[in-house]
Curated annotation (Swiss-Prot):
It catalyses: Endohydrolysis of (1->6)-alpha-D-glucosidic linkages in dextran. This is Dextranase. Residues 619-636, 706-761 have a biased composition (Low complexity). Residues 1-38 form the signal peptide. It comes from Streptococcus salivarius.
Length: 822
């Protein structure tokens, strides 16, 4: 048998390595010398890593894929996660729960999270971590009296750093948790110009019931700026945080103390008017080494923030906010895309979106709780979060060029990992099913592997006409804005030398993203097959169009593809103006597909890459090829308004106070010129498929940690080093388990190579395929510390000629970080 590693960028094979093995029946082996060489990698680039096990005839016995991001700047492609208090212990962050947090962080690491903000981990807004205090109870938190152990926070920050990620300290940018005894004089506070956060002329105050919880300063006040800068710098220094995730309560028209009773609007200003100056003041006062961003609730202040030196852009979006699309609120998937587009156009950055699906409503003043919406009924009935409700928002935001912040580590005894459903992060009523975590894992790999296609530099909305039809010729793409349901929402984007077509399935469902009615508002669309996408190639010559038609691929994070990029059938027609039209056959659509159209018609082939052993590896796979790359179905080569409408909706517990130092240097993390991939391989018998395809129950995987690779521009290629981490062993059984039907696990390593320019390689040409169910790669996300896959051969079930041709994984017998507790 052969164990193969393929590194791919888009449709290009960048590099390959393989190891040949001979195993006797019942034997096992560990492969530890597969490598990803640093010269294969370039900075701020996403790759797909495929590891497969093939028999001696080239048939794929097992395979897995993972996204790899090589980056020296996490802000280019932010993948934001949350650490917050445990609902099991009064929303507290405690030392006794560290092990649970560690498991969640390992799983999030495997999902390529490169930045975390620690939510409500502070003592008070004006004194986040009192010096010399090992543990404190949040006095302002009257509903749960949360306790925070500073040792627990510090250890979790350290773990985040060890994973190569950054840790942000959450805090409000202008709040004081002591309304009756604020830290600064009353002259520094912001005063309501209208009745809003209290009465006109009174200090702007957030109240829960009759209890004032926070009072707010004017962010433009220089005394406040100096005070909070000193407080935050001290807290971040002591606890090891890398930056500040600033929060706002929403926009409001305010005055200073002197003009608090004025009725002249000229004496007032919007709080958002001072966001940019506040951020810039923090950069000057705290220092450029600390990252900072603020939550512009519901967006809309892009012009004001355009000159702000914030490192990433973060918007918490609500359905009560006005859409970028005129005359609407931001209630539909298309409204999310419109906001992401606006931020990209104004700032050039990829928007981090906080958008909470379902948001169960439960009135706990009633004994046992009373549901106030459908999602609340689901929670009281013990139902889990709808997977597709989450995935459709993930898909929409990623396809638009943003990142949906949704995954949280909460040390929740009822969930191995949490998906945010409400604005107060420790309170997530709906459990998260194991299969939902698996699908989320696959989406995170996809978003990482194809980050340059989704939100790379120069990627913009395309002006080329695009449409989708079903097999009967009915147009399914009815609304390009994405605000109408029961359609295949189809839009095109373009980048340097390529185009993509994003397909979001809303057939049979509405376009609302919030889904507060839960299962009563089903978010699982009707799966589609045999679709035809037509993309205008207006302006291309016939010769250019013909070449482009031979460079069309389809991929998806869903189970039928799990990130594999497949050559698509494509032909050419002409429109009424005689312009070429690309006609693409799409075999299947579950939730989200991406078509990749390579438009560079002038590139010339380069020498094939050379593997570690010095053997030539052909990186062009023909449709007749029988190599492991061709055989593997998973292979790729690679305004705020006058009244405070832009405020957060009220929540059961207030979302009061939320918040990366550069990742460890290359010198600290690396010590060799290539990424070793350790794999333990063995074999288990199953019925061999005559058609060489591998069904769901036939598929095995090679498991390892997620691959997020910070890179250093300063280090030379010769000195570049990489360390590889992989997690606990994957065990194997010859007896099928109920989880074998989802058999695509994660391939991931932690690697740190230097920036290296990479020459283009040949395009992958896979067999033009109509994808079958046997290619479905539903799998359990596996996180491993030692990338080992044990494959055992059963002598009584395997003939001498086939003993090296089969593999089977039993995930229920797998000891995997973050999965055992599912």
């Amino acid at each position: 048998m052969t164990v193969n590693l393929t590194l791919q960028h888009a449709s290009e094979i960048i590099g390959q390595d393989n190891v040949d093995l001979t195993l006797a029946a019942g034997a096992s082996a560990k492969v530890s010398n597969l490598t990803v060489a640093s010269e294969w990698l370039t900075n701020n680039t996403g790759y797909l890593v495929t590891i497969s096990v093939n028999d001696k005839s080239g048939n794929v016995l097992s395979s897995k894929r993972a996204g790899l991001s090589v980056e020296d700047d996490w802000t280019v492609f932010p993948r934001y996660g949350i650490v917050a208090g445990s609902p099991t212990d009064q929303n507290s962050i405690l030392v006794k729960n560290l092990e649970a947090y560690r498991k969640e962080l390992e799983l999030m690491k495997s999902m390529n999270i490169n930045s975390y903000f620690f939510y409500d981990a502070y003592n008070e807004a004006t004194d986040p971590f009192p010096e010399g205090v090992d543990s404190f109870v949040q006095k302002w938190n009257t509903w749960s009296h949360t306790q925070v152990d500073t040792k627990a926070v510090k250890e979790l920050v350290d773990q985040v750093h060890k994973s190569g990620a950054v840790a942000m300290l959450y805090n409000m940018i202008s709040a004081d948790s002591n309304p009756k005894n604020p830290a600064l004089p009353l002259a520094a506070l912001a005063y309501n110009f209208y009745d809003s956060f209290g009465k006109k002329g009174e200090p702007m105050t957030y109240t829960i019931g009759d209890n004032p919880t926070q009072v707010y300063y004017d962010p433009a006040n220089p005394d406040w700026q100096k005070y909070i800068a000193g407080v935050m710098k001290s807290a971040m220094d002591r606890m090891g945080f890398d930056g500040w995730q600033g929060d706002t309560i929403g926009d409001n028209r305010v005055t200073d103390y002197e003009h608090r009773n004025s009725t002249d609007e000229a004496d007032s200003h919007m709080m958002s008017d001072s966001y940019a100056s506040f951020i810039n003041a923090m950069k000057d006062l705290i220092g450029e080494k600390y990252y900072i961003t603020i939550n512009d609730v519901n967006g809309g202040n892009d012009d004001k923030l355009a000159k702000a030196r914030q490192d990433v852009v973060y918007n918490e979006l609500w359905t009560n906010g006005g859409s970028v699309i005129p005359g609407r609120m931001q209630v539909a998937y298309g409204d999310l895309k419109a906001r992401i587009d606006m931020v990209r156009n104004k700032t050039g950055k990829s928007l981090i979106v906080g958008a909470y699906m379902e948001e169960p409503g439960i009135d706990y003043t009633v004994p046992g709780g009373k549901a106030t919406n459908g999602a609340g009924k689901d929670a009281l009935a013990g139902k889990p979060l709808q997977a597709d409700a989450t995935l459709l928002v993930d898909a929409t935001v990623a396809a638009a060029g943003g990142y949906h912040m949704s995954i949280a580590a909460l040390a929740n005894a009822n969930a191995a990992l949490n998906v945010l459903q409400s604005a107060y992060y420790p309170t997530q009523y709906l459990s998260v099913a194991k299969d939902t975590i698996r699908k989320l894992y696959n989406y995170q790999q996809f978003i990482t592997a194809y980050e340059n296609l989704l939100r790379g530099e120069g990627v913009t909305n395309s002006t080329q006409a695009v449409s989708t039809k079903n097999a009967s010729g009915e147009i399914l793409s009815k609304d390009a804005l994405g605000v109408t349901g029961d359609q295949v929402w189809t839009f095109a984007k373009s980048g340097k030398g390529f185009s993509t077509v994003q397909m979001i399935n809303m057939m049979g469902i509405n376009a609302g993203w919030h889904n507060e009615e839960g299962y009563a508002d089903n978010k699982t669309p009707d799966a589609q097959e045999n679709l035809t996408v037509r993309l205008s190639l207006a302006g291309k010559t016939a010769q250019e169009a013909a070449k482009i038609a031979d460079q069309v691929y389809v991929t998806s994070p869903d189970d039928w593809a799990t990130s594999s990029m497949k050559k698509a059938q494509a032909s050419l027609e002409t429109d009424e103006n005689g312009q070429p039209v690309l006609v693409i056959s799409v075999p299947k659509l579950t939730l989200w597909n991406m078509l990749y159209i390579k438009e560079d018609t002038t590139a010339t082939p380069v020498e094939p890459v050379t593997n570690q052993a010095g053997k030539k590896v052909d990186n062009t796979v023909t449709s007749e090829a029988s190599s492991e790359t061709a055989k593997s179905e998973n292979t790729t080569v690679n305004k705020g308004s006058e009244a405070p409408t832009d405020t957060k909706p009220s929540v059961e517990a207030p979302k009061l106070d939320e918040t990366t130092k550069p990742a460890p240097s290359v010198d600290e993390l690396v010590n060799s010129a290539a990424v070793p991939v350790a794999i333990a391989v063995s074999e288990t018998a199953h019925d061999k498929k005559d058609d060489n395809s591998v069904s769901n129950t036939d598929q095995g995987t090679v498991a390892s940690d997620s691959i997020t690779t910070p890179a250093s521009e300063a280090a030379s290629t010769a000195a570049s080093t990489v360390s590889s981490e992989v997690s606990e062993s994957v065990t194997v059984s010859s007896e099928p388990s109920e989880t074998e039907n989802s058999s695509e696990a994660s391939t991931s390593e932690s690697a740190t190579p230097t920036t290296t320019a990479i020459s283009e390689s040949h395009a992958v040409v896979e067999p033009v395929a109509s994808l079958t169910e046997s290619e479905s790669q539903a799998s359990t996300s596996l996180v491993s510390e030692t990338t080992s896959t044990i494959v055992s051969v059963a002598p009584s079930e395997v003939s001498e000629s086939t003993s090296e041709e089969v593999i089977l994984m039993d995930y229920q017998k797998t000891s995997i970080v973050g999965i055992d507790s599912l």
